[in-house]
A protein has these predicted regions:
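Helix-coil modules at protein/domain termini and other flexible surface or pore-lining loops
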Residues: 1-207
Length: 207
């Protein structure tokens, strides 16, 4: 995490049924180039799996051995208005899931500590409780218990306040797993994807 994270303008260059800074073909080509240079077996192949009944192309991205070992899954699905959009979608689903699990597996990304020791450096328990709509009436007691738990904390950036904050990674991962993990052609594009997914899942749970 850099000392300061800044959102920049991301100009749309592709607007065919979606707004992106690159075309779907450029997205696929960028991934293939970066994956080849990583020295990891991430993507085995992509396959078109729809039968044309709905007129919506659907692709699967089949995990390479390194991705399969890391994520525990064999494939992801992606859809789009065109076959190349669907293929790019399936690949980016793999990218975000693989990246999340790889991040989780790297001890250098975390510090194990109690919230009671981190104090103002960490996200407050009140915010965590609101994020899951806790209406138990035992917030104070649960907060004291939570503050004493040794957890893995990772550095994040609070976009609203413009500052770093420590997040209890495993607390979020246990509840959400890969909900909200996101990939894009740039930081801003990825964040739009991830934030919208969190809103989508939250509303779904709410109703």
């Amino acid at each position: 995490m850099p000392d300061k994270f800044t959102l920049n303008d991301a100009y749309k260059r592709f607007t065919g049924d979606q707004d992106k800074v690159l075309t779907p073909r450029e997205t696929i080509d960028n991934f293939m180039q970066k994956a080849a240079g990583a020295g990891l077996d991430i993507l085995k192949e992509t396959r078109r799996v729809d039968r044309g009944r709905l007129g919506i192309p659907v692709y699967s991205s089949i995990c390479g051995q390194d991705a399969k070992n890391m994520t525990g899954t064999a494939k992801q699905m992606g859809k789009g208005a065109t076959p190349v959009q669907a293929e790019a979608s399936a690949i980016m689903e793999l990218v975000e899931r693989f990246s999340l699990y790889r991040f989780s597996a790297n001890p250098a990304n975390f510090q194990t500590d109690r919230q009671a020791d981190l104090k103002d450096k960490s996200m407050s328990f009140a915010v965590l409780a609101r994020s899951v709509d806790d209406i138990s009436g035992n917030i104070d007691a649960v907060g004291r218990f939570f503050a004493d738990l040794p957890l893995r904390w990772t550095t994040a950036w609070n976009l609203t306040r413009g500052e770093k904050v420590l997040l209890p990674f495993d607390w979020f991962f246990a509840i959400n797993q890969f909900n909200g993990s996101c990939a894009g052609n740039c930081n801003e594009e990825a964040l739009c994807q991830g934030i919208c997914e969190v809103v989508e899942r939250h509303v779904c749970c709410d109703i």
